[in-house]
């Protein structure tokens, strides 16, 4: 056959399977089954954009660079087979009914059962606090008191004195650096926390965005880019700001701080998830709601990651009344930084504004008490495992 003659004349092969562990395994298994001995090179793509595909063909990699990736996938396959086939058969025989055992599934199930047992056995404990409303304009709280009689006695003493002594006012400037770029796990956590999407839903959405050339490769465990990508990211953030119409709206969208996103040592198979330049020409309103929301998260995180830190002044007030110490904490924003990006880009996703107390300027002195109240509370049980917690613990994306 002519086609067979053409095959025999081929001296080397290129394989473009999914650029990840399982894609590597699929090609190697097929290659081994064919008995082919020809040399082969790897086409490794992090984006489906035409420019990225052309660059990939221009920079084909020797297959030997991905031998460790293939071996890792092969170990995963063999481990799943050994544990799943053998243990499922063993426990099905022991219990007289079909019982599936999995290398990942069974430990996760055990972890969940232990947590649910702890929740079921939890007995809530009451506690009490005394709250003082001061004329300075803030509310100070006592420590937690387990005995109601002791709390009521403290309340009575405070109401009798109606004067507190401010012992200490500590002010400290603090800052929060921007979050890193998204890897798959952090994207899934945010999508679950903010949008209620399951980890699988988020993966489906971002995979579809990748296939539509709107985002880069989704199955990455890196939150960084390489030095080669830094110039690309700087240009992309400028275009994103212009695309969203926010660049001139606030000083927090200043020169992008891309250097903090660069760490070649922490980029394994793929860099962090980014929007592509093709996205800038796309009709985002035509996307399904889930895909549009996930894309908005990725755009916001890309801009947040290169923005200024969030700076604020934290004030801790310590006051004394009836021999008991009361405390109040407040916060004053100095520079909104990356939180301004989050607020503006995700305005329709963030369910509520961040609330905090601003304490007035105070000095160490006596302060009158306007009112004193007794508050009752209960200790909380451990939290049920959620998609967010499962992603945080790495049990969804690192099988």
Mark where each language-model region is.
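Toprim catalytic domain recognition across nucleic-acid enzymes
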Residues: 1-399
């Amino acid at each position: 056959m002519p086609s067979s003659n053409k095959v025999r004349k081929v001296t080397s092969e290129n394989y473009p399977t999914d650029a990840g562990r399982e894609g590597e395994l699929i090609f190697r298994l097929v290659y081994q089954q064919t008995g082919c001995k020809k040399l082969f090179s790897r086409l490794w793509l992090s984006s489906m954009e035409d420019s990225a595909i052309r660059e990939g063909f221009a920079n084909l990699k020797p297959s030997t660079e991905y031998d460790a990736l293939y071996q890792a996938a092969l170990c995963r396959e063999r481990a799943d087979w050994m544990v799943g086939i053998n243990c499922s058969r063993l426990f099905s025989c022991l219990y007289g009914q079909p019982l599936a055992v999995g290398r990942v599934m069974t430990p996760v199930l055990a972890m969940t059962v232990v947590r649910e047992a702890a929740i079921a056995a939890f007995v809530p404990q009451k506690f009490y606090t005394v709250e003082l409303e001061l004329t300075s304009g803030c509310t100070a709280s006592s420590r937690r008191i387990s005995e109601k009689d002791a709390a009521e006695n403290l309340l009575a003493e405070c109401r009798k004195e109606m004067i507190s002594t401010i012992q200490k006012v500590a002010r400290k400037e603090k800052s929060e650096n921007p979050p890193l770029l998204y890897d798959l796990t952090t994207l899934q956590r945010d999508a679950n926390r903010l949008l209620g999407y399951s980890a699988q839903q988020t993966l489906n959405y971002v995979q579809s965005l990748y296939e539509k050339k709107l985002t880069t490769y989704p199955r990455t465990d890196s939150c960084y880019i390489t030095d080669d990508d830094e110039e690309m990211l700087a240009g992309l953030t400028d275009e994103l700001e212009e695309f969203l119409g926010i660049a001139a709206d606030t000083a927090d969208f200043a020169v992008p701080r891309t250097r903090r996103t660069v760490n070649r040592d922490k980029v394994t198979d793929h860099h962090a998830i980014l929007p592509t330049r093709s996205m800038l020409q796309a009709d985002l309103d035509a996307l399904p709601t889930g895909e549009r929301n996930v894309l908005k998260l990725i755009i916001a995180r890309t801009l947040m990651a290169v923005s200024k830190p969030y700076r604020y002044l934290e004030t801790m007030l310590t006051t004394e009344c009836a021999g008991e110490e009361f405390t109040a904490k407040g916060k004053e924003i100095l520079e909104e930084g990356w939180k301004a990006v989050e607020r503006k880009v995700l305005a329709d996703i963030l369910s509520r504004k961040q609330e905090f107390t601003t304490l007035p300027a105070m000095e160490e002195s006596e302060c009158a008490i306007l009112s004193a109240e007794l508050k009752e509370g209960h200790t909380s049980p451990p939290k049920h495992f959620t998609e967010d917690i499962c992603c945080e613990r790495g049990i969804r994306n690192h099988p």
